[in-house]
Structure formats: structure tokens, C-alpha cells
């Protein structure tokens, strides 16, 4: 495909998605659901009693990252064109025996069974069909795509014929941990090398070999950022790696869409730019998420709550840019796979996952689950409680919180609640390709900045740079760019026209605009920010009516520094403490590790607030009210006019 045809297709998809967003925003939440790798029937009964009737079934054919089978049932995909549908049916029928009212999210395992990997190797595709660890190599392999597409079609047709409208959605799962992550780190076999040549031709680039692997592990500028003047092939290869995965996923999504009725949804794990760090930010394959988010064949995306900010006092958060998916009219499913003190750590007599640190006690479990439920409910997101290998939701106290969370989600989750954020975090996948993702600073760019904003004491939203051309930026008084390394002339014009406006504060961190898309030049940093590259601390300069804040070091971007900038910009700080706040419409959630009496400030006047888990009503005076929090605690307030 020519570059122009590719760009026209992407723009058309974006316009179609924008039309969906303009017509009514993101998809309504699909479900409050239950999921486990293993058939935890007693837990399913407890969730049924709590009003949860949607169950995710993962009829896996493959092993997990620990080498253990995902599934307790026999594999479904047994050979080319040979399927054990009796095993598939039993997994759904066993749930129906426990809960005759159950409906399903059907997760389709598109990873390679060991027999397929071995057979394709014998056909000359050695190392090019292990989709779990070498995803981009498998996606570039026509033989793998053909066999996998045939399996996908067989499963979907069978499910539609046997279970019909009990299926709410199909989840297309592949790659490392079935989250479409690529662990090949740039390795290319014959098929991927041929696909690279085709990609270069389609993008108007001269033919060149796959970059040497040792070049992928270093970068020209401070061993952190790549210079497009000398490393353009590496930047292109990073985009190609993501493109070959996205092209494959788009093909599977279109194939599935053609086999199901319109009301059935399609979802997948993708777009983890706020989570992936060491060796995965660039080479994990998720940076090309914008093409998937613009697809009319995909209805929603999924991620676990972030793994890096789960303890008490942390803000959790989606791994994907929430503002981008909303702008594209997509739904979201928040995976609550957080560990409680009762979770099962032993997969068998030899393998355990005890290194996964759980919440410490029932008080932390209650506060943590309320935090996760509030995050999903306030953002109009679906969710599932992921029981993994059992025992996570074991106590009656835990299930009482689940039942309460389900009722509140049903009441508020499907309402079109207007966001309350006055702070925007902007990620830029095009700039992220510049990063040497083996550098220790990589974890500070997006994951680290998001975790610090989690302690702002005010809500914030996350957008992608390309969203800035069409999102309404008027509510945002502070805009944060922690990784805007590439500022082309087109990007510079967009910043000037839409972002750097009178009355707004814009924070740039570490080398913003150092590249214009062709070369690196540190002098460009001062041109953009008014401050020299290496000046320590957070510098503030007035620039034509707007305020440019600049931090040369990620270490200077502390929660305290962010709160100071936000307050100076006029952002409503709901709490003086460094705590997470979620807010939209009439809902405000505040989570604390250490309780006590706190004064809460609201963005709008109201008569009183009602804490929805306890029913406690507190009067509001001058947009403020006192509230006594437990240790730890999450409170979900409804503002009463």
C-alpha cells in the first residue's frame, strides 16, 4: 500500500470514530463481570448472589508465562482443522449449571499451541510461529495467520450457533500473557525480514536490512534518545514492528465482525503506553495503538489496573490513555486482578506466585476494591473481578464490598458523566519510538509521571498528542508533556494553535522538542520552553500570555511540584494531601492510606454530599466539607444539588 493510501485509510477511520464519539461518546459499559483462569464454582455462586451474572471464559490451548497450562480443561485446538468443541462446550455449560442466568465474555486464545509451532517449524518457519514470545515474527508469517484465522472462525461460528445471545463479546487474545505484547526485541526471521522490505516500499523508504540487534540497545543522545539523522532505520523499524502486529489484529477483528451480529462486541488488551517500561515501551508493539482505537471493528479495550501503584495511597489507573479511547468512542474494561490476603499463590506443587504482594488485610482489601470500583464507575468503564487461580474474593466481607460496588456501578456507570479534570497528561507514541527502552529513565516518562499525578489531590485525564487537534481543551488549566521529544513543524503549529494559550500552564519535562523529525539539537529545548536544557529544578517562564514550566530532570517532577503548578494555574485541589482523586459528573472518589479529618474542596457548589458506601450525608458550605476517613479508606461521594 502506498503511503498516501495508508494515510487516507487512517484518516477515514479516525473520522468515522470521531463521528461515533460525537454521536454519544464511548460505548456504554458492557458488564460488571467475574473471571478466573480456573473453574472456581463456589466463587461463581458467590458472585451470582452478589448480582454478577457475566462470566469471562478463556478456553486456552496454551501455557502461561510460568509454563503452566492456563486452562484446567483439555485444549480445543488439536490440529489443523481439528477442534475439540466438547471441551469448549463443557467450559460454558459448567458455568450455566452453577448460574443458569449467566452470559459470557468469550476470550479466544489465538496463541500458538505447541503442535502448531512445531509443525510450522518443520515447514520452514522455525522461530516464526511462537506468538507468545515472538509475536511480531508470528504476525509476519502468512502460514501462522492462515491457521490462526481458521481457528478463530471455527470458534466464533460454533459459539454463535450454540450459545447465541448469551455471548456479549469476543476478546481476541494473543502475544505475551495474551495482551498482544511482543517479546522478540527486534529479532527477525525470514518472514519478518520480507515484511520489513514490503513496509519500507509501502512507506516510500529505500530498501535496507533489518537493523543490527546491538543498535537497538543503545541510542545516540545520552544513550536515551535516538537521532533521526543517524538512526532513522531504527525509528522506522520500531514503527514497523508495531504495524505488523496491528495489521494482524485488525485482520482478525474484521474477520470476527463479519461472523457476528451487530450487537455483539469485540475487545482486546492493547495500548499500554502508561505501563510498559524496561525493554517493552518501544519493542513491546503497543505504540501503534491509535490505529486500533480508530477501528470501527473494535468496540472496547482492556487493561489491568497499573501494577506500579497498587498499594494503599496509590492511585492505580488505566494502562491506556483514557481520553484517547473516549474521543474515539470506545468502551473500556478495567481488570481488577489485585491480590487480597486470601489469594491462591500455588499453581502446583512446584510453581508459586508468592512474589506478587497482596493487600495486607481486610481493611486494605475493602479500601482497594472501592478504589478500583470507583475508578471504573466514574469513568463509565466495564470491569471484571479477576480471581486468577482462586481465593481472591474469598471472605464474606470482600463479597459485601463487591455487591455494593455492583449496585453503584449499575446506578452510575452507564450515565454520561461529564469529566471534572482540569489537568491533562499528554503521551506521544511517536516521540516514544525515540527512546532506548533499556535506559533506567524509561520508567519515569509516562508510568512515573502518571503515578505522581495520582497524588495531585485532583483528577486528571490522559490524551495522546494527536488528540489535541480535536479534543476540547478549554477545561484544562495545566497540561503535562513528560515525553514530547519530537516536535515537527506540524506539531509546533498544533501546540501554538491549541495548547500554548493565554491563561494555561504547560509543563515540559526532559528534552522537549529536541528533535524536529530530522535531527537532534538541544538548542530547540530553550526555543520551546524559554529555559536552557540542563537548568536544575522546575523553571517557569511567561511566554506570550501562557506559562511555560520546564523540568530538565524527571526527579524534579514531584507530587509537591505538580500541586504547586496546579494551584498557581487555578486548578481545583480537592484535598491538600497527596492523594488520588477521581471525579466526573456528580461523583467524587478520594482514596487515602492514612485517614483522619480532611477538608475536601469541590469544583462546584452543592447543598451536601452523600458517601455512597456508608450512606453518610455531610453538609457543604462554600464548596467545602470536612470528612473523617478511616485508615485506609476510599470514599465515593455524590454531590447533591
Q: Can you annotate each of these PLM segments?
A:
Residues 109, 117-307, 315-316, 321-322:
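Polysaccharide-binding and catalytic clefts of secreted carbohydrate-active enzymes
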Residues 29-38, 68-86, 130-150, 230-247, ...:
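The substrate-binding groove and active-site-proximal loops of carbohydrate-active enzymes
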Amino acid at each position: 500500500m502506498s503511503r498516501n493510501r495508508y494515510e487516507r485509510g487512517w484518516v477515514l477511520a479516525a473520522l468515522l470514530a470521531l463521528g461515533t464519539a460525537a454521536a454519544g461518546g464511548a460505548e456504554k459499559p458492557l458488564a460488571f463481570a467475574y473471571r478466573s483462569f480456573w473453574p472456581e464454582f463456589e466463587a461463581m455462586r458467590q458472585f451470582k448472589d452478589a448480582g454478577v451474572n457475566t462470566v469471562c471464559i478463556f478456553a486456552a490451548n496454551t501455557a502461561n508465562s510460568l509454563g503452566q497450562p492456563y486452562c484446567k480443561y483439555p485444549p480445543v485446538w488439536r490440529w489443523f482443522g481439528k477442534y475439540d468443541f466438547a471441551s469448549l462446550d463443557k467450559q460454558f455449560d459448567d458455568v450455566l449449571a452453577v448460574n443458569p442466568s449467566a452470559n459470557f465474555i468469550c476470550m479466544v486464545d489465538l496463541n500458538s499451541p505447541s503442535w502448531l509451532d512445531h509443525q510450522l517449524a518443520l515447514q520452514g518457519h522455525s522461530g516464526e510461529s511462537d506468538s507468545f514470545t515472538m509475536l511480531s515474527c508470528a504476525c509476519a508469517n502468512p502460514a501462522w495467520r492462515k491457521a490462526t484465522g481458521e481457528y478463530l472462525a471455527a470458534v466464533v461460528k460454533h459459539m454463535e450457533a450454540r450459545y447465541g445471545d448469551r455471548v456479549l463479546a469476543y476478546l481476541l487474545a494473543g502475544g505475551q500473557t495474551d495482551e498482544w505484547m511482543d517479546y522478540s526485541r527486534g529479532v527477525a526471521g525470514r518472514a519478518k525480514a520480507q515484511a520489513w522490505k514490503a513496509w519500507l516500499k509501502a512507506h516510500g523508504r529505500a530498501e535496507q536490512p533489518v537493523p543490527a540487534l546491538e543498535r537497538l540497545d543503545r541510542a545516540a543522545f545520552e544513550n536515551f534518545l535516538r537521532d533521526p539523522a543517524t538512526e532513522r532505520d531504527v525509528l522506522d523499524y520500531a514503527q514497523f514492528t508495531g504495524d505488523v502486529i496491528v495489521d494482524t489484529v485488525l485482520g482478525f477483528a474484521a474477520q470476527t465482525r463479519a461472523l457476528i451480529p451487530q450487537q455483539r462486541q469485540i475487545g482486546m488488551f492493547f495500548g499500554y503506553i502508561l505501563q510498559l517500561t524496561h525493554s517493552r515501551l518501544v519493542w513491546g508493539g503497543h505504540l501503534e495503538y491509535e490505529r486500533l482505537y480508530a477501528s470501527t471493528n473494535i468496540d472496547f479495550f482492556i487493561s489491568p489496573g497499573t501494577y506500579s501503584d497498587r498499594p494503599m495511597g496509590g492511585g492505580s489507573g488505566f494502562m491506556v490513555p483514557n481520553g484517547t479511547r473516549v474521543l474515539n468512542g470506545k468502551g473500556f474494561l478495567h481488570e481488577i486482578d489485585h491480590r487480597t490476603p486470601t489469594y491462591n499463590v500455588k499453581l502446583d506443587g512446584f510453581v508459586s506466585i508468592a512474589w506478587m504482594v497482596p493487600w495486607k488485610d481486610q481493611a486494605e482489601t475493602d479500601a482497594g476494591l472501592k478504589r478500583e470500583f470507583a475508578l471504573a464507575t466514574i469513568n463509565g468503564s466495564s470491569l471484571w473481578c479477576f480471581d486468577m487461580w482462586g481465593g481472591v474474593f474469598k471472605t464474606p466481607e470482600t463479597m459485601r464490598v463487591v455487591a455494593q460496588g455492583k449496585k453503584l456501578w449499575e446506578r452510575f456507570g452507564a450515565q454520561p458523566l461529564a469529566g471534572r479534570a482540569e489537568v491533562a497528561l499528554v503521551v506521544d507514541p511517536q516521540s516514544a519510538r525515540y527512546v532506548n527502552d533499556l535506559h533506567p529513565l524509561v520508567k519515569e516518562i509516562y508510568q512515573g509521571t502518571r503515578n505522581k499525578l495520582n497524588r495531585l489531590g485532583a483528577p486528571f485525564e490522559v490524551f495522546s498528542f494527536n488528540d489535541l487537534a480535536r479534543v476540547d481543551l478549554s477545561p484544562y488549566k495545566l497540561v503535562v508533556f513528560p515525553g514530547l521529544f519530537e516536535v515537527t513543524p506540524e506539531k509546533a503549529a498544533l501546540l501554538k494553535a491549541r495548547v500554548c494559550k493565554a491563561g494555561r500552564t504547560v509543563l515540559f519535562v526532559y528534552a522537549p522538542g529536541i528533535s524536529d523529525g530530522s535531527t537532534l539539537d538541544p538548542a530547540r529545548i530553550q526555543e520551546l520552553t524559554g529555559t536552557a536544557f540542563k537548568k536544575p529544578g522546575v523553571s517557569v517562564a511567561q511566554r506570550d500570555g501562557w506559562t511555560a514550566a520546564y523540568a530538565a530532570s524527571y526527579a524534579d517532577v514531584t507530587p509537591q511540584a505538580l500541586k504547586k503548578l496546579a494551584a498557581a494555574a487555578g486548578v481545583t485541589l480537592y484535598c491538600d494531601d497527596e492523594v488520588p482523586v477521581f471525579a466526573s459528573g456528580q461523583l467524587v472518589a478520594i482514596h487515602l492510606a492514612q485517614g483522619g479529618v480532611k477538608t475536601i474542596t469541590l469544583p462546584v457548589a452543592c447543598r451536601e454530599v452523600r458517601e455512597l458506601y456508608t450512606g453518610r450525608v455531610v453538609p457543604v458550605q462554600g464548596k467545602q466539607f470536612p470528612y473523617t476517613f478511616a485508615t485506609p479508606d476510599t470514599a465515593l461521594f455524590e454531590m447533591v444539588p
